[in-house]
């Protein structure tokens, strides 16, 4: 059997950069929707009507995951579908109702919506839980949920997660959850909300779109 030469990791990385070779990132998968719960689920009131005419009419929430050497980091977000702005987010090492609530509470703090808002999500345990639904009810918010196993019913948030991973996460190898948290925070608040141009918004960023339509 032929044996190769011993080569250090840093030298391999340098040679790969010179040759324009990139290592393929292994994409770990983990389920985030727990359908095995006792709580009732809402009907799909949104019904894929993603083009919203005013802010704070429809919010959409969902969760995803990012792998680090320490283990999984979970991300919950709330988007205003009018401008695709991430108005609430939370990260943690457990996939819990509390994570969803923290993202939603941030959204409430930023926006202070009037009663009548529609909140769309999947029908997992975090969003169907009594305490989360009670929180929606306390603010006069109606719940809408995707059909079973149909990610297209929440396509706007799924699209955000896909873009986040393609543009950021799949190019990183996070050692700690704190490292990933800081990176994702900067992506959301510095880049995506303020600078990233969206084709659905006429190639304005969410912040530009909201500022432009507020003046119009």
Please name every model-derived segment.
Residues 1-216:
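Charged DNA-binding/catalytic regions of mobile-element recombinases
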